[in-house]
Structure formats: C-alpha cells, structure tokens
Amino acid sequence: METNNTFNAYDYFKKLAETNKLAQSNNFKACFCSGPEGINDVMQEFRKYANFIMIDDTTSQNTYSKGVTFFDKNVYTVFILASYTFDDMRDREEKLNLCRRIFRQIHSRLIYDKNSMLYGDSLEYLDVSSIYSKELPRYSMNGVTGLYFMLNNDEPVDLTFNADEWQED
C-alpha cells in the first residue's frame, strides 16, 4: 500500500518559516542548508541577515516493516538561529527565548494543520506528537544561538517484487 503522497515537506517548512508573524517581525530569513555542515555556508549571509530558519534539505531515512506493510521513515531537521551581541549573555538569553517561542508556534501550527486536514491527508504520517529538539550549547557558534528540531514522517511504501523490472539471465 504505497501512498501517492506528493507532499513536499521542504516547501511546507519554508512556508511556515515565511508566514510566522514572530519570525517576520524579527527578520528571520527562511532558507535551505545541506546537513549541519551546510550551516556555515548560510552563516556567510549574516552580514545581510541576523536570523535564520534553515530547513535541512537532506533527510535521515529508514525503511522498516510494521506487520503486513513496509514504511519509509524520513527525519526532517529545521534550525532556528538568531545572532546576539558577542559576550552579552543577556542578549543571548533573549534571542534563545525568541527561538524557543518560534519553535513552539511552528509546533502548534504543525498540530493544527494535521488535525484540521488543511493539506488533505498529506500530513497524515507526520508525527507531530513527538518532536525532538535540541538547543545549541553556549559557545557552539560565536554570536549565534538557537535550536534545531527533528520531525519524523513514516509513509507506507510498496516493496512488492515486480519481475518486469529485472532482466533474466
């Protein structure tokens, strides 16, 4: 039972970042990065933008069996980062609290969108009931604080063998 789910999680997360009023009022730029290593490339734009919501365009994946069918688990990661005045721990705490608030608003929007079927059944397999998040340590990036969160999406996949896909010896 493979789903014909054409839902684009990356575009969805970018839209959430671009339409959140708190993120807009604090000039967060929505963009993509390729894994944690890609963050440094985006950081080069800190001269133009002080705050970012970065959607990791790579996923961790796992295919597993759950009884009679198989599922593809995709793990999506989103970084919410804000710059602060270097060595100003009060400013750092304020910016970290801002990132926390944006994350909570995004989480509540995920729950709302899934429960209201706003996107049809596209969000059906998105696990909004358990989202892992981790805050950046104090000195992980000079002058930058924030957090990232990870969201699982488990979709059925059809792994039925099809002999027509194989050349016989």
Which role fits each region the language model picked out?
Residues 1-68, 164-169:
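Small/polar-rich, solvent-exposed N-terminal microdomains that initiate assembly or binding
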Residues 2-11, 69-73, 81-112:
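Extracellular/virion structural assembly segments
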Residues 24-26, 96-154:
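Acidic-leaning, charged glycine-interspersed low-complexity segments
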Residues 62-65, 83-88, 156-162:
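Short, cysteine-centered beta-strand-loop-beta hairpins and adjacent loop/turn segments enriched
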Residues 62-68, 131-141, 162:
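Catalytic micro-motifs at enzyme active sites that drive phosphoryl/nucleotidyl and oxygen chemistry
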Residues 70-85, 142-157:
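Oligomerization/assembly interface segments of phage tail-like spikes and tubes
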Residues 148, 158-168:
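Intrinsically disordered, low-complexity regulatory tails
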